[in-house]
Amino acid sequence: MDLAVKVKKMGLGHEQGFGAPCLKCKEKCEGFELHFWRKICRNCKCGQEEHDVLLSNEEDRKVGKLFEDTKYTTLIAKLKSDGIPMYKRNVMILTNPVAAKKNVSINTVTYEWAPPVQNQALARHYMQMLPKEKQPVAGSEGAQYRKKQLAKQLPAHDQDPSKCHELSPKEVKEMEQFVKKYKSEALGVGDVKLPREMDAQGPPRIDSPGGDRSTAAAVGAMDGKSAEHRRTQYSCYCCKLSMKEGDPAIYAERAGYDKLWHPACFVCSTCEELLVDMIYFWKNGKLYCGRHYCDSEKPRCAGCDELIFSNEYTQAENQNWHLKHFCCFDCDNILAGEIYVMVDDKPVCKPCYVKNHAVVCQGCHNAIDPEVQRVTYNGFSWHAAAECFLCSCCSKCLLGQKFMPVEGMVFCSVECKKMMS
């Protein structure tokens, strides 16, 4: 790929969703504008998923690329125009007759994603077992939840080097090897089935009492009934509660078909969010979303949100950073060797802190320097100095003294308070 094509590709990435309103900040955001290397809006600092950006095609391309060169190629289709794999997302449309006084109207419900099973009744039952606010009905809170989780759980920059910022050829190669490895060893897609269907597919087995499944019948045909008619109890691998007869369960092939989950329990073991579209990563007996599986394997830069494939990086505030990305969250100046203040877990240089985040002294009405001692009470702050923390009436210094606070003012006595009231 020559330089002109690379620049064009980067430009298109930054044009996507440009100007879209922020669903979180509302009118406070001027519209989405992607930061050059952070995965956030330059105007409001929210992620792209928080903005009203239509990403269905882009998300389908991302998931399609994830399934490329895996056993899940049946879930993708390659476009004839450019050969890019697209996720064949299963959309389910249900029609429910609604009785009226004179005629019957049709109420249509569209799910932006549904488990790819032939039995629509099973898929519908699966959806009903999810919390209502997480059911991906088009135009609903659940559809927005799915959109956010696709962005959060399966970041494009965790699988595609072209979505990362200035990787070296060596880092690109290491990333490609890492992606190939997790596709072959950890990636999977859940199956929705009825537990009794799974028993019918293989020979009956009896597990230990402490396992996920136990049988109430004895081995053999002691009571004259065949093994296939034995009553079997199932428990969820996550919550350990029993599965109800007739309820769908989720199986994960990499975990083994002796384990099963309630639909609402098929969650990442780290963030505990529903695994979006049942896409999971399996490691050491636990389910992970893509993001947290990768976090368990590689350090992630707190600045650009990308995995770190370089041997040289820095650690600060219990987080990892590319050397070039340990920057002020407000102005992007590099912070190596500089004084900084953490604001909402983001490093901010001293000038930006004083300008944008510092609390104002109730005494002198100037910003309080981060290195200066202060007195704070009930949301109000003062410089810890005799000329600032003093009685609002008689100007007596109150450092180390009892005081009476009244709406940002402080008094040394009841008398002074009465004089100012």
UniProtKB/Swiss-Prot annotation:
One GO-annotated biological process of the protein: negative regulation of cell population proliferation
InterPro entries (UniProt xref): LIM1_Testin (IPR034958), LIM2_Testin (IPR034959), LIM3_Testin (IPR034960), PET_domain (IPR010442), PET_testin (IPR033724), Pk/Esn/Tes (IPR047120), Znf_LIM (IPR001781)
Compartmental location: Cytoplasm; Cell junction, Focal adhesion
Disordered: region residues: 134-164
Domain PET as annotated: residue spans: 92-199
Disulfide bonding pattern of the chain: none
Domain of life, source organism: Eukaryota
Any one GO MF annotation of this record: zinc ion binding
Keyword tags: Cell junction, Cytoplasm, LIM domain, Metal-binding, Repeat, Zinc
Ranges of compositional bias, category Basic and acidic residues: 155-164
Residues in LIM zinc-binding domain copies: 234-297, 299-359, 362-421
Annotated GO CC locations: cytoplasm; focal adhesion
SMART domains: LIM (SM00132)
Function as written in the Swiss-Prot or TrEMBL entry: Scaffold protein that may play a role in cell adhesion, cell spreading and in the reorganization of the actin cytoskeleton. Plays a role in the regulation of cell proliferation. May act as a tumor suppressor.
Subunit structure: Interacts via LIM domain 1 with ZYX. Interacts (via LIM domain 3) with ENAH and VASP. Interacts with ALKBH4, talin, actin, alpha-actinin, GRIP1 and PXN. Interacts (via LIM domain 2) with ACTL7A (via N-terminus). Heterodimer with ACTL7A; the heterodimer interacts with ENAH to form a heterotrimer.
Record text about domains: The N-terminal and the C-terminal halves of the protein can associate with each other, thereby hindering interactions with ZYX.
Family: Belongs to the prickle / espinas / testin family.
Protein name: Testin
